[in-house]
């Protein structure tokens, strides 16, 4: 939160993967900041299509007391432990000496175990230079070391977020460097069940991809957002890059009823 304040942001979204564990700590930190910062509570929900394509859905301002959504997030978190063990087994089979204990050192209390922690372990072991390199070389969706985990279908994930009063945004839908992306017909199906927006302005989208996604969003009646996808010092993304316009945010905010933006 302090980094967001120092970057001059008015609003920042907290969307850890498949968890709301950081909400209270983040909200409590606002009063000590040098500037007035609004906190948008949410989660980045891991989903998977029937064609086994990984999809990330940003759920914002939902009611975390909603039982069905909370259980779906818990199911995904629980499956990440055996998944991590299998990824490590595959890496070690290729001669890459990393252990589960190495990964655990990079997982904060309450955090959702995931590939970023494995990436940080590879950096600490000097196997790669940074987290982005770890994903490029070993951890992307097309890698032989990649292992999937239990995830809701994106259609169901959107329905869960909307039923909990939240906003549903399809994250980095054209980030081909991460792996196969859903096609326009799949996005149209998501729009039919309540998807609010496409995250168009993102570091992983070139100008041609952004133009294509803007056209698709207009055709489907979806709003257009931007995001830094900031993950801390381990990732090259700058906090505050690729922002969402005030006009778009105000329209999204008007659709949410699960929880409110938090101010100190």
Which residues are covered by each model-predicted region?
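An N-terminally biased module of ancient metal coordination in phosphate/nucleic-acid-related enzymes
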Residues: 1-52, 139-140, 152, 158-159, ...
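Mid-domain alpha/beta scaffold segments of enzyme catalytic cores
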Residues: 17-82, 86-107, 112-117
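Active-site gating loops and adjacent loop-to-helix segments of metal-dependent hydrolytic enzymes
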Residues: 48-81, 120, 124-143, 240-262
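Short hydrophobic/aromatic-rich motifs at helix boundaries and adjacent loops
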Residues: 59-61, 92, 128-130, 158, ...
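Short coil/turn linker and secondary-structure boundary residues
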Residues: 64, 98, 113, 152, ...
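Conserved acidic, metal-coordinating active-site core of Asp-based
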Residues: 108-175
